[in-house]
Swiss-Prot record:
Keyword set includes 4Fe-4S: yes
Involved pathway(s): Sulfur metabolism; hydrogen sulfide biosynthesis; hydrogen sulfide from sulfite (NADPH route): step 1/1
Protein's UniProt keywords contain Thylakoid: no
Keywords: 4Fe-4S, Amino-acid biosynthesis, Cysteine biosynthesis, Heme, Iron, Iron-sulfur, Metal-binding, NADP, Oxidoreductase
Protein name stated in the entry: Sulfite reductase [NADPH] hemoprotein beta-component
Pfam annotation, one family: NIR_SIR_ferr
Enzyme class at the top of the EC tree: oxidoreductase
Names of required cofactors: siroheme; [4Fe-4S] cluster
Binding site for siroheme: 483
Cofactor: record remark: Binds 1 siroheme per subunit. Binds 1 [4Fe-4S] cluster per subunit.
Record-listed [4Fe-4S] cluster binding positions: 434, 440, 479, 483
Domain of life, source organism: Bacteria
Length: 570
């Protein structure tokens, strides 16, 4: 829709079944507490299967053994994924030791998975361990509230280890925004923490009785790093500093990457600039954006319910004016900002506070003791002696933050001894995948298990063409929901079927352009053949400093996506 012909503010029609479920759930309680005591099944039944998502969990099963169990007349091996709420990715070493122990003692896979939304997940929690995991988190000051389903999810914040003062201020705002937008229901405390039911009725002044129409994602960004991939998110606060101090934010609204194969009403979209706001209006504006989306978002069709679609339907100016009205402010013109990169600086960086920060590359964020590389043990040993904190990055890496000079050698020795500082190529550092098989029920093709060997082959192509130290931002996502953020990559692979992917090209290094589909439903050999040819051309024909994605657009190999609502599928 253009601004001249905006659509209706509210979509009329039969509400989706998810809306019924939320309304009937008694503020997210459902019958989860009763279901916990049902030992006949390893899963949650009926509405509870979806309601547990509001409590930070997804019900999954091991798809590698699904058919085998069906043959044996057994139900799937149900287990939960739990995702922690961790604004800005900051976790204390005490908390880390607690989650390390839980992963080892109480999960099927024994691993900790860092996510590209700056938190960690446990995979493979059996039903009997579901309540204990929430209680363990609570005992160390953590929770899993609102990390899934139709709420404001984990709030991201640039992991900038260098500008310590600015990071500290931005991180405080990420925490404040997260707290302000949390659900107020007491369901979480009652079910998991055995807190008394109180006689007062629940109220949700911001989210409402049926919560948001769809998931909602928020970031706080410190330029020039776009490590948190702001354009994947509904609401983004871009930090504006004067003399190293935070003074306000530019607001960008309506980013999002999820699509559905073949559904032309769905598209990936970059966020739109609304304007600048001084710090004191931050929470009012955050609330206004969320409540506008709450009231105007499409509750009849979940595939069309995210903020990006609301913005396109009602028109950017209409949405922006409503946010101004609700927040009681007028946006100032956007202040200048620019992004220069989004990868993590692997290795040691000295902050302006003279403390050191060690960024460790964790391939696909999977922390486990591998043969010859006991990563999980290494991080536990570091956590036992480190006085600072850990920070999870949006690139699925881990920062050992605020290391004094006196501890630097000791921590480096532990990291090296446990394979945490093994040299990897620039290409590997800039490649990322979602979890996908065997645990994700939506997976159509491999992602995390596919990427390491696929990266080997791309490294060989770079070597063949004489550019082994170059890198291309490369992402693999197992389905079009897009958790791997392939829709902001220079090379994006989107799972279509086992062993088959759609190949997208034409994003850029800084994550401000959506890549277009180049080839559909192709196998790994076909993908590699295309990349061999195109990387060969890039190596020969590129301009100074020109990234692969920019080259594919300039050379006419792919047309850039300029207006996704209209040209994403062309």
């Amino acid at each position: 829709m253009s601004e001249k012909h905006p659509g209706p503010l509210v979509v009329e029609g039969k509400l989706s079944d998810a809306e019924r479920m939320k309304l009937e759930s008694n503020y997210l309680r459902g019958t989860i507490a009763e279901d916990l005591n049902d030992g006949l099944t390893g899963g949650f039944k009926g509405d509870n299967f979806l309601l547990i998502r509001f409590h930070g969990m997804y019900q999954q099963d091991d798809r590698d053994i699904r058919a085998e169990r069906a043959e044996q007349k057994l139900e799937p091996r149900h287990a939960m994924l739990l995702r922690c709420r961790l604004p800005g990715g900051v976790i204390t070493t005490t908390q880390w030791q607690a989650i390390d122990k839980f992963a080892a003692d109480n999960t099927i896979y024994g691993s900790i998975r860092l996510t590209n939304r700056q938190t960690f997940q446990f995979h493979g929690i059996l039903k009997k361990n579901v309540k204990p995991v929430h209680q363990m988190l609570h005992s160390v000051g953590l929770d899993a509230l609102a990390t899934a389903n139709d709420m404001n999810r984990n709030v991201l914040c640039t992991s900038n280890p260098y500008e310590s003062q600015l990071h500290a201020e931005a991180y405080e705002w990420a925490k404040k925004i997260s707290e302000h937008l949390l659900p107020r229901t007491r369901a979480y405390a009652e079910i998991w923490l055995d807190q008394e039911k109180v006689a007062t009725t629940d109220e949700e002044p911001i989210l409402g009785q049926t919560y948001l129409p769809r998931k909602f994602k928020t970031t706080v960004v410190i330029p020039p790093q776009n490590d948190i991939d702001l354009h994947a998110n509904d609401m983004n606060f871009v930090a504006i500093a004067e003399n190293g101090k935070l003074v306000g934010f530019n607001l960008l609204v309506g980013g999002g990457l999820s699509i559905e194969h073949g559904n032309k009403k769905t598209y990936a979209r970059t966020a739109s600039e609304f304007g600048y706001l001084p710090l004191e209006h931050t929470l009012a504006v955050a609330e206004a954006v969320v409540t506008t989306q709450r009231d105007w978002g499409n509750r009849t069709d979940r595939k069309n319910a995210k903020t990006k679609y609301t913005l396109e339907r009602v028109g950017l100016e209409t949405f922006k004016a409503e946010v101004e009205r609700r927040a009681g402010i007028k946006f100032e013109p956007i202040r200048p900002y620019e992004f220069t990169g989004r990868g993590d600086r692997i290795g040691w960086v000295k902050g302006i506070d003279n403390n050191w920060h060690l960024t460790l590359f964790i391939e696909n964020g999977r922390i486990l003791d591998y043969p010859g590389r006991p990563l999980k043990t290494g991080l536990l040993e570091i956590a036992k002696i480190h006085q600072g904190e850990f920070r999870i990055t949006a690139n699925q890496n881990l920062i050992i933050a605020s290391v004094p000079e006196s501890q630097k050698a000791k921590i480096e020795t532990l990291a090296r001894d446990h394979g945490l500082m093994n040299a990897v190529s620039a290409q590997r550092e800039n490649s990322m995948a979602c979890v996908s098989f065997p645990t994700c029920p939506l997976a159509m093709a491999e992602a995390e298990r596919f990427l390491p060997s696929f990266t080997d082959k791309v490294e060989a192509i770079l070597e063949k063409h004489g550019i082994p130290d170059e890198h291309i931002v490369m992402r693999v996502t197992g389905c079009p929901n897009g958790c791997g953020r392939a829709m902001l990559a220079e090379i994006g692979l989107v799972g279509k079927a086992p062993g088959r992917y759609n190949l997208h090209l034409g994003g850029n290094r800084i994550g401000t352009r959506i890549p277009r589909m180049y080839q559909e439903n192709i196998t790994e050999p076909d993908i590699l053949a295309s990349l061999d040819e195109l990387i060969g051309r890039w190596a020969k024909e590129r301009e100074a400093g020109e990234g692969f994605g920019d080259f594919t657009v300039r050379a006419g190999i792919i047309r850039p996506v300029l207006d996704p609502a209209r040209d994403f599928w062309e």
